[in-house]
């Protein structure tokens, strides 16, 4: 088990500079698998994985979702939890802090190579919900949405609900609102161009050895992401930088 860094209600693992807990009066905002692995080289199932310098395999690179989430960062605690990482010619910097209503995060990447590089950045938060079958996500209505399971694009009609595996990219910058009946979680991105919404459902979840039985019912991922035009990344010139942010607010339903 790694040593964690705590600042108020926030707990961070140095592996991935990974926010694993955000305790508030309504309960933890974040889901963490009961069988999550805290080992360098392994992704932590739950919390807020940091996705860089690419998302999934969209840029045809491995490992999926990049190396930021599986590498040990240098983490400094304080009123803000700050972390830094240098790897493969990139410098990454993350800041995490609590607010009265939840928490905020920023992640920046600078290109220290001599070449223009295509990169992608994202936060991949696992938000805790009571039951995914009773949960809705609003904010995408009327926007173009890419279904990553079928590679089809359509306009989102109505709120998002879940009845099976769900993996879609909302193209745009909406404020997304998760409602599980007992509380509301508002997710706002900064510097992003998409929101990814994901839940694996039972069949896909059974393939994960780091997710407890039926725990897929207790989270939804709503992910501010900078993916670039046609999901092919953004160009960062030598010495240049790019950043994204996320604001999370939680409130109890009346």
Q: Model regions: which residues?
A:
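Short, acidic/polar linear motifs in exposed loop/turn regions
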Residues: 112-115, 252
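Beta-strand-rich N-terminal accessory domains
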Residues: 1-45, 174, 178-193, 201, ...
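Hot-dog-fold acyl-thioester-processing enzymes
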Residues: 30-67, 191-211
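Extended, loop-rich substrate-binding clefts of extracytoplasmic carbohydrate-active enzymes
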Residues: 62-100
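Active-site/ligand-binding surface loops and adjacent short beta/alpha elements
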Residues: 117-118, 126-196
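Acidic/His-leaning functional-site neighborhoods
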Residues: 162-238
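Asparagine-centered strand-capping/turn motif at beta-strand->loop junctions
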Residues: 12, 107-113
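Short, hydrophobic/aromatic beta-strand segments
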Residues: 21-23, 115-122
